[in-house]
């Protein structure tokens, strides 16, 4: 899935997602895209689920780019474990998404098919998104 091969540190701080995206807010590769409208932590499973729904809708036509990658680890302690005794083990990997970030891009398909595919992908994501196009 979408996890890094190697990291400098195994566990990250939780942190906050503040402000708007400083980069990655314009279409770079495709003609159509899905833009985040609110801050969120996207898991690698959610990104993979959205990617699958896009590829099923497009049916091997066009090209898809995924512009979000999971760099941050999230740790969790097991059930019925008391507080303390160190930080828990890594549970999942997440991508911290700021408002304005382009998540997916599509090219080589019609406007209607791209809108349908990205709307299905949007339903898999836990935040509000907007369909963007370089034509509009």
Curated annotation (Swiss-Prot):
Part of the 50S ribosomal subunit. InterPro entries: Ribosomal_uL16 (IPR047873), Ribosomal_uL16_bact-type (IPR000114), Ribosomal_uL16_CS (IPR020798), Ribosomal_uL16_dom (IPR016180), Ribosomal_uL16_sf (IPR036920). This is Large ribosomal subunit protein uL16. It comes from Ehrlichia canis (strain Jake). GO terms for molecular function: rRNA binding; structural constituent of ribosome; tRNA binding. It comes from the Bacteria. GO terms for biological process: translation. The keyword Transmembrane does not apply. Binds 23S rRNA and is also seen to make contacts with the A and possibly P site tRNAs. NCBIfam families: rplP_bact. Keywords: Ribonucleoprotein, Ribosomal protein, RNA-binding, rRNA-binding, tRNA-binding. The gene is rplP. Belongs to the universal ribosomal protein uL16 family. GO terms for cellular component: cytosolic large ribosomal subunit.
